[in-house]
Amino acid sequence: MRYRYIFWDFNGTIIDDVRNSLGCVNDLLDRKNRPHITLDDYYNYVETPIIGFYRHILPPEEINFDEISKAFHEDYGKRIVNTRLADGAYELMHSLKEQGVHQYIVTSNHIDEVTDLVKRFGIYDCVEKILGADNTLSESKTQRAKELFDSLNINRNDAVFIGDTLHDLETANTLGIDYILVEYGHQGKKLLRSFGAYTVADLKGVEKILYDERRVDFHTHSTRSDGTMTPAELVQHAKNVGLSAFALTDHDSVDGIEEAQNEAEKIGVEFIPGIEFSAAEDTEIHIIGLYIDPRNEKLLKTINKLKGSRKRRMEDICRKLRSLGFEITHDEALLIGGGHFVGRAHIAKLIVQKGYCNTVQECFDKYIGLGKPAYSEKNELTATEAVESIRAAGGLAFLAHPHQTKYNLNQLEELLLKLKAVGLNGLEGYYSEYTPEHIADYRLLAQKLKLAFSGGSDFHGAMKPHIAMGTGKGNLNIPYYVLDNIKDIKSSQNS
């Protein structure tokens, strides 16, 4: 079992009441001599707070929300006898209880109404707490969920929110936990997926994810950039640490992909060819490419352009370090990189070897990090060019570790909108060094801009010994459904 704590939405998730709600809405429209809406209309219009839904179907002068809400709940109460549990809900919730999984219901509906239904359907003993509204307004569900989550003091990797709407996705993102959205609820598959969300058809799909302990990592490096494992060693390490799939995303290089692909086929690890482009706006930007064609002409042209730029930049860093009194040469750093590649991490390792600093991180913090005295700007590739090169190679493009830029959330949103216009698919929603605030901020931003998210450890081997492949600092656990979502996006992109 992947999760130990499950937060359930109620309406449209545990109970299948969409047609009841649609009937109530059309009864209201009858009373106002307005045409009925269809189920597709309902899927497209439902939102939270619910008053937004009525703005889609009624003119402003006919919206008296207190009156509408009272009438809806009276009509819904009459239809309660027709409400039923979603297929498989009883069996799944009881099975989870038997396995010691903690289950909670968080709903926008009145708590008494929900409690009565939960008892009626025989699942009351499965849940430890029901959190609902104490009036008829559909609001504050997310806040109730957050207060409960914070009070439990649990690991985010152990929790999941199961729901059926974008509001449920927002709640999960606010908590910084995984989500599962069902397609039979109050918002359809088309709308949910347009926001980059992954959906399943029914509770059998939910159960499959709950029991699927496969893990993935979309951000790793080999000796073909600044990692310390060869591509083949990296594949073997992925298998050893229990990953089902991973991406090799060397900096500005595809040189290790063929070796990694061959090894992955031999030992049965699912491999994703990737790259991490280093680019510049008014700050340093990294763009991850997944499922790229490493032979693509435009991609290779961009990489060749960067090779010359990288060498000039590393030589400039070495010159600046020498001006600070360090005896450092580019050729020495190249030896550290195994003769393939020189990055700042290799220079930092050389500095440590020569006794100028105690750790690689100290080198970055004092000398070669952004804004430090030996830092050298990148100016050969824009983020737009990076995204365009990835997309030209048939890949998907994701903004890597946005917290490492100097952007605040508003500036980050502007960047993402700009890059989305040229093909950006998403950003990293999982990362080894994210705080809980980072997780919530970036996932909510992805949802707002209809972007998907990837994620990864940023594993470098001994170059970053505190970062483990697949688990980061012990805080990373990327479920396989994230890869399923990326595959679906890839398939849609190709069709």
Where are these regions (language model features)?
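Metal-dependent phosphoesterase signature
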Residues: 55-94, 101, 364-378
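An N-terminally biased module of ancient metal coordination in phosphate/nucleic-acid-related enzymes
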Residues: 211-284, 368-369, 381, 387-388, ...
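Acidic, Mg2+-coordinating phosphoryl-transfer loop and its flanking beta/alpha structural elements
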Residues: 160-200
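Conserved Lys-Pro-Asp/Glu-containing loop-to-beta segment of HAD-superfamily phosphomonoesterases
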Residues: 2-5, 141-169
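Extended substrate/RNA-proximal surfaces in nucleic-acid metabolism proteins
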Residues: 263-417, 476-485, 489-493
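Substrate-recognition element of Asp-dependent hydrolases with the DxDx(T/V) motif
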Residues: 89-119, 131-133, 247-249, 396-403
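Active-site neighborhood of HAD-like aspartate-dependent phosphohydrolases
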Residues: 1-44, 58, 247
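Short, acidic loop-to-helix structural element flanking the phosphoryl-transfer center
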Residues: 78-105, 111, 115, 142, ...
